[in-house]
Design a protein with these regions (language model features):
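Short coil/turn connectors at secondary-structure junctions
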Residues: 45-48, 67-69, 112, 123, ...
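ATP/pyrophosphate-binding catalytic subdomain of soluble kinases
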Residues: 103-207, 211-216
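ATP/NTP phosphate-donor binding region
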Residues: 1-49, 64
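Short, glycine-/small-residue-rich phosphate/pyrophosphate-handling segment
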Residues: 78-117
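Gly/Ser/Thr-rich loops at beta-strand to alpha-helix junctions
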Residues: 3-7, 51-59, 76-80
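Short, acidic/small-residue loops that bind anionic groups at enzyme active sites
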Residues: 61-88
């Protein structure tokens, strides 16, 4: 795909001559579908591992390609939960030992859950971290910050270090680590959550319950917008029905620590 900053070409020019580098010739329309298409092409070309540079949205777009290739998601922004902050050299090394078969992929990676959004029985979107149901009737700037407009929240897991909507679920006194369904509003408790970097909000929570796998939950709000991983993407009308389902078959994510540990123990770095 287009690389206006020439990150890949500069990196390739400084690498060993015996490493073959192929650049994908794909058209860009400046939307998240560019990442989905690029991932699809890589899968077709037989990629053994993919490194993603971006945030939750970038990885969500890659997941749309039906990725069954291990991912090394590297965070390049703020307010992210799915990708990790890691030094690029070690991330690339982990991807290398996975791609070359130097380690057992199943032993050094985890199949992450995700949330599917269905409207009137058709899958319209997915989220890797959270789905927020907002009373706001239009998409607008897409990014969702106003907690007062949130009716309910679905999370794929309880992530203690999360920022954003998922931090609300992580601030609850719960023992589960998997999916959770949270209804916001009066009548319950209030939690302090970092919904934006550097800022904490007091959020009223009416109730919460575990979100079992493969059991669709109907959205209670009759009209409004659905935000996936922090961005509004779908408008729902009064004559429509929306459901959120937690599924197990999300992206397979490489643990950089486990991959490098396994490679080292196997003598992969001995020269």
């Amino acid at each position: 795909m287009p690389d206006s900053l020439q990150i890949t070409s500069v990196a390739a020019s400084k690498g060993p001559d015996d490493i073959e580098v192929e650049f994908l010739e794909t058209q860009s329309i400046g939307k998240e579908s560019d990442s989905t298409h690029a991932a699809s092409v890589m899968i077709e070309r037989g990629a053994s591992c993919m490194v993603t540079l971006g945030g939750d949205g970038t990885n969500r777009a890659v997941a749309f390609a039906g990725v069954d290739v291990p991912l090394v998601p590297v965070s390049t922004g703020t307010n992210n939960v799915f990708p990790v902050l890691v030094e690029g050299t070690t991330a690339g090394l982990a991807a290398g030992v996975v791609a070359t078969g130097a380690v057992d992929v199943a032993a050094v990676s985890t199949l992450r859950p995700m949330l599917e959004v269905h409207v009137d029985g058709t899958r319209r979107d997915l989220a890797l971290i959270d789905v927020a149901i907002s009373r706001q009737p239009y998409l607008g700037a897409r990014a969702i910050w106003d907690v007062d407009q949130i009716e309910e929240l679905f999370v794929s897991g309880v992530y203690p270090t999360s920022i954003g909507m998922a931090s609300i679920a992580a601030s609850l006194p719960v023992a589960v680590s998997e999916g959770l369904h949270v209804r916001l509003g009066p009548g319950g408790i209030a939690v302090s959550a970092p919904v934006t970097p550097g800022m904490f909000s007091t959020v009223p929570v009416a109730e919460w319950s575990p979100l079992p796998f493969d059991e669709p939950k109907t959205v209670s709000l009759s009209s409004g917008t659905i935000a996936v991983d922090g961005e509004r993407s779908i408008v729902i009308h009064a004559n429509q029905s929306a459901e959120i389902t937690l599924v197990r078959d999300g992206p397979r994510v490489v643990s950089i620590d486990r991959a490098l540990t396994a490679a080292g123990r196997a003598g992969g770095f001995v020269r």
